[in-house]
């Protein structure tokens, strides 16, 4: 029937068992008749707590004296299941009511604004029997998409100019590119004046040569957002599909619970025990054995991997640890293997050390303008032997000395153009 959309904010809400869940409810009713205790084993997040409460309420309606307890775990593995069973707790009613409140807010806002939009917009569109729905989560996201689209459409590329200085030596096959410290300017005339001063100077002079140790940080503990973002970029899989596959692997006992924003491990987390389960793997088993030997205090051979506890982040939801492998896996399907391999390699790499190198920075001056370049010598790729999704390569440059003078092999003005830092939307049909 018809009603004022605002009335839906006060209308009573009724709950019932859906047709799809009727057999499940019947099964619970039958099982609870001869039971004294109900243990809730749903996922250990707010949604799982709410579902567990619904199950408990249904069972209590059939057996009032039933004892209800909650098992908390993060992975479907024997150790955690036994520990959860020995440390049963009560349901967290705060989490239950929080989900109830969110569901009611979503329902009321969605129903009210859907009715309002449909009533006001359908006559303007001259269509019949059309519903224009509103979702409290989806609508703001749609706003981001529209805003992004408008920025892309409004973007106007702007030309800029810069000085391109290169130096070719007999010791290296390719010329060294020196980056202008001003980067670029939007006034061609000014750039040409500065370029002219450089040409008048004829020679460039080395003003500074600095060598310093540098490193590339190993990956941090894995959260849901990082898993979806990085693996989607690496494989092209949709973020939802990645999470669905991770949940399937969790249900098989191969991964920990994949819905977590925690990037910190507890102090008593058993890293070595999980590493030991991966020693049999044909791809990374030998490298994991090096980590295990290092963790046990054995003398590490030159070039071998060294164990180091993962570096903690800043977030801890106190519910689940970061995503990690809980068992070794064999015979996975193609996409499942991509998800499992990424999670496992990232966990293993987080237990190794940072990659180490030495960076050389060279600064020069020519005609009052300053330029710089840098070289890199990688000493130890460390964690990247396991985390093959990242690379760090040597960048060789000639040996320069302070106050050394040389003539550039290239000294020109080049033009560039500003561009969007994100991909433009594909053409519409």
PLM region spans:
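Intrinsically disordered, low-complexity regulatory segments
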Residues: 1-113, 304-309, 407-417
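Catalytic phosphate-handling regions of large nucleic-acid enzymes and associated NTPases
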Residues: 250-278, 308-327, 354-355, 361-373
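C-terminal or mid-to-C-terminal helical accessory/interaction module adjacent to the motor/catalytic core
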Residues: 80-160
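Long, highly charged, low-complexity internal segments
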Residues: 1-17, 129-247, 251, 284, ...
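Extended, well-ordered alpha-helical scaffold/bundle regions in very large, multi-domain proteins
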Residues: 237-305
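Hydrophobic heptad-repeat coiled-coil signature
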Residues: 426-428
């Amino acid at each position: 029937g018809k009603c004022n959309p605002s009335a839906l904010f006060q209308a009573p809400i009724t709950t019932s068992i859906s047709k799809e869940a009727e057999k499940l409810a019947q099964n619970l009713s039958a099982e609870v008749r001869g039971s004294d205790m109900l243990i809730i084993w749903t996922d250990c997040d707010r949604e799982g707590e709410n579902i567990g409460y619904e199950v408990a309420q249904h069972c209590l309606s059939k057996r009032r004296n039933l004892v209800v307890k909650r098992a908390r775990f993060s992975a479907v593995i024997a150790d955690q299941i036994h520990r959860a069973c020995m440390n049963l707790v009560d349901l967290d009613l705060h989490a239950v009511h929080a989900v109830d409140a969110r569901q009611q807010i979503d329902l009321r806002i969605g129903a009210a604004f859907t009715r309002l939009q449909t009533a006001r917009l359908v006559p303007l569109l001259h269509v019949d029997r059309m519903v224009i729905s509103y979702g409290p989560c989806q609508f703001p996201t749609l706003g981001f998409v529209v805003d992004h689209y408008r920025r892309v459409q409004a973007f106007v590329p702007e030309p800029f100019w810069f000085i391109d200085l290169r130096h070719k030596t007999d010791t290296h096959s390719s010329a060294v590119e020196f980056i202008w410290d001003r980067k670029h300017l939007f006034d061609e005339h000014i750039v040409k004046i500065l370029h002219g001063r450089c040409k008048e100077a004829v020679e460039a002079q080395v003003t500074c040569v600095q060598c310093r140790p540098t490193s590339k940080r190993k990956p941090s503990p894995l959260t849901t957002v990082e898993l979806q973002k990085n693996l989607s970029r690496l494989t092209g899989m949709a973020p939802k599909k990645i999470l669905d596959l991770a949940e399937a692997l969790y249900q098989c006992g191969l991964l920990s619970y994949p819905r977590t924003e925690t990037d910190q491990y507890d102090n008593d987390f058993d890293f070595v025990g999980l590493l030991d389960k991966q020693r049999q793997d044909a791809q990374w088993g030998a490298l994991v054995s090096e980590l295990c030997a290092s963790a046990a205090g054995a003398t590490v051979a030159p070039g071998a991997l060294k164990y180091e506890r993962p570096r903690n982040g800043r977030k801890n939801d106190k519910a689940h640890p970061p995503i990690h492998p809980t068992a070794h896996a064999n015979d996975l399907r193609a996409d499942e293997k991509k998800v499992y391999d990424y999670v496992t390699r990232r966990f293993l790499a987080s237990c190794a050390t940072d990659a180490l190198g030495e960076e050389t920075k060279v600064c020069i001056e020519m005609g009052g303008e300053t330029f710089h370049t840098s070289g890199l010598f990688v000493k130890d790729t460390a964690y990247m032997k396991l985390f093959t999704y990242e690379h760090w390569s040597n960048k060789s440059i000639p040996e320069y000395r302070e106050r050394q003078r040389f003539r550039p092999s290239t000294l020109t003005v080049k033009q560039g153009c500003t561009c969007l830092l994100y991909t433009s939307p594909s053409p519409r049909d």
